[in-house]
Amino acid sequence: MNKAVIYTLPKGTYSEKATKKFLDYIDGDYKIDYCNSIYDVFERVDNNGLGVVPIENSIEGSVSLTQDLLLQFKDIKILGELALDIHHNLIGYDKNKIKTVISHPQALAQCRNYIKKHGWDVKAVESTAKAVKIVAESKDETLGAIGSKESAEHYNLKILDENIEDYKNNKTRFILIGKKVKFKYHPKNYKVSIVFELKEDKPGALYHILKEFAERNINLTRIESRPSKKRLGTYIFYIDFENNKEKLEEILKSLERHTTFINLLGKYPVFD
């Protein structure tokens, strides 16, 4: 029986595109499958599948739900990463007849200036692909969708304007999650992701964490705080850093002195 790599519906999203790219790197007989939400992906993966979920957008920031679930599902690890260029397109029937534009909230936010210039109303839906589907099924010329070229092709709609995003360096990082995987090859770049809680909330507490990395010449690629969900004003921290095989065990051991817990979320290759 084929094993599955799972992403979130609907079809035609960047999540599907990222899943297909990961499939090119994975060694083994895998099929693509899908479910309804990021949480559902984690649940399916917990039963020995693989999953692909977004974790960070260069414009809108991190995907909080993905970060929370990486902490909640402790047996699931980050196995790989890739980034996709995100280009938004106006999709529909006739640009001059559009009154309302629909899309995912992040896509609407990333095209705010373009939408404002045209004076259109906006409506948020759960995904860019769902927006394109709504426009296709409604056959309403006053509706436009913001979505990908793949979605437009899938639903046989026109691309009325290309690359309408406000910022042209728009990228989204996707991660492959699961318990284990074998890749066809290993790229040069590797990352490590951890999450931890500081032992004491006092001046300089985070400095001592960062100092451990600086003393070992380990480069951080991301640091971010999230509410601990224990009480207001308490936080946990997520850090990504470039993998240093010789110093990895040493740095993790050194961080234990300053933290109440530290979880290794994954050691993984970064694919182009």
From Swiss-Prot:
Q: Which cysteines are joined by disulfide bonds?
A: none
* ACT domain sequence ranges: 194-269
Name the top EC class.
lyase
The question of whether Lyase is a record keyword is answered with: yes
Key words of the record: Amino-acid biosynthesis, Aromatic amino acid biosynthesis, Lyase, Phenylalanine biosynthesis
State the oligomer form and interacting partners. Homodimer.
Protein name (Swiss-Prot/TrEMBL): Prephenate dehydratase
Q: What is the lineage of its organism?
A: Archaea, Methanobacteriati, Methanobacteriota, Methanomada group, Methanococci
Q: Which gene encodes it?
A: pheA
